Design a protein with these regions (language model features):
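Short hydrophobic/aromatic beta-strand or adjacent loop that forms the aromatic wall/cage
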Residues: 49, 162-164, 324-329
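Conserved active-site alpha-helix within GNAT-family acetyltransferase domains
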Residues: 251-285
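Active-site metal-binding core of divalent-cation-utilizing nuclease and nuclease-like domains
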Residues: 6, 11, 15, 19, ...
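Active-site beta-strand termini and strand-to-loop segments that position acidic
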Residues: 52-57, 168-170, 332-334
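Acidic, metal-coordinating catalytic cores used for nucleic-acid/nucleotide bond scission
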Residues: 19, 44-46, 67-81, 107-111, ...
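Basic, glycine-rich
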Residues: 1-11, 15-22, 88-143
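A conserved beta-strand-loop-helix scaffold within acyl/acetyltransferase catalytic domains
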Residues: 128-232, 238, 248-250, 258, ...
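Short beta-strand-loop-alpha-helix junction that forms the active-site gateway
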Residues: 43-86, 182-187, 200
């Protein structure tokens, strides 16, 4: 396969057909190289469609090209999709107990993101090296030091945070898993902290296979709660009584959230706050686009709101909706959240 730094939209339906088949071949190769059984073009009783489906491991994959997954403009022969359609698909998958992974073309054609995407399929199908948390230790360091780790092992890369909790192999000292924490953006001051991002090694000792750290999440969670008894997210003296945690619905179903308290360290509760659809913006190949954006899919950018709105109107910027995020919160027992949000 050939990786692409910038995406170009097809100019006619024949180009689109060739493009779509190419994207599907990339995903198909992952299944076949790992000897994972699959069916193609499956429609379930509730209307959910999957380009690929593995019944044994309850895994569905949808290949999302931009031309047929745009909500702001009619492209070629495709009608605009609804802003909530990917979110609705995610709900349908959950109803069936299926994990739906969305294969966006910019990600499976990206040299770094492709391998993280591949690992998602492998992991769901039980293809991983098992490591036990008892053979690891937790190290607390500034979050920025883990940026290379996230760039290699998380499909979204690194996100700004304050403190990293790193699970390391006791013998080799190599980092295996990490959670970072920082100020909570959700709730505008109602919550003390958020898990900014998590990641696990996706290419253990250059085997092309990632790892599962048995009891790793609960071990990291235990240390975060201990740390939060006397510290703020940035390490200054304080206390963390509430922690927000996000699930990216484009790839995950959130089932692991219920196991965060398995360590039994401290009582408290984990609740689901909200599940909201999302979207990103595809900056088409036009002259007025900034060079850093042309041919790329970007997150929301409030500073460019006027330019983006204009781009929607003239069709030079496309809205690509997605399944969004589910937001959870942990609250220590006996704690009442602040009633008034702070700015």
């Amino acid at each position: 396969m050939t990786f692409e730094e910038r995406i170009k939209l097809p100019t006619n339906m024949e180009e689109w057909k060739i493009r779509k088949q190419y994207l599907k071949s990339i995903v198909r190769d992952i299944f076949e190289e790992n000897k994972i059984e699959y069916k193609e073009n499956v429609t379930f009783n509730n209307g959910l469609f999957a380009d690929f489906y593995n019944e044994q491991h309850c895994l569905a994959v949808e290949v999302c090209d931009f031309a047929s997954h745009c909500s702001s403009k009619k492209i070629l022969d495709f009608e605009r999709i609804g802003d909530k359609q990917p979110y609705t698909n995610w709900q349908k998958a959950n109803e069936l107990g299926i994990r739906l992974i969305c294969a966006y073309e910019n990600e499976i054609l990206d040299q770094k993101k492709y391998f993280v995407f591949k690992n998602m399929i492998q992991y769901q199908c039980g293809i991983f090296h098992r490591v036990f948390a008892r053979n690891t230790k937790v190290e607390i360091i500034p979050a920025l030091k883990m940026k290379p780790f996230y760039e290699a092992n998380n499909i979204q890369g690194y996100r700004n945070a304050k403190t990293a909790f790193v699970l390391k192999d006791k013998k080799t000292e190599e980092p295996l898993m990490c959670y970072t924490i920082g100020a909570a953006y959700f709730g505008k001051g109602m919550y003390d902290c958020e898990i900014a991002r998590g990641a696990c090694v996706i290419n253990y000792h250059n085997t092309g296979i990632g790892i599962q750290v048995v009891a790793g999440a609960s071990k990291l969670w235990k240390h975060i709660l201990e740390y939060g008894e006397t510290h703020n997210p940035d390490g200054t003296p304080g206390r963390i009584n509430s922690i927000v945690y996000y699930t990216d619905n484009r790839y995950y179903d959130g089932r692991s959230i219920g196991h965060l308290m398995d360590s039994g360290f401290e009582s408290g509760k984990v609740e689901t706050l909200a599940t909201t659809p999302g979207f990103m913006n595809f900056w088409d190949n036009i002259e007025e686009n900034p060079e850093t954006h042309r041919g790329k899919l970007k997150n929301r950018e409030p500073a460019r709101h006027t330019l983006i709105t204009q781009g929607y109107r003239n069709g030079n910027i496309l809205c690509i909706p997605n399944a969004g995020t589910t937001t959870h919160v942990y609250i220590r027992d006996g704690i009442e959240l602040r009633n008034e949000k702070t700015n």
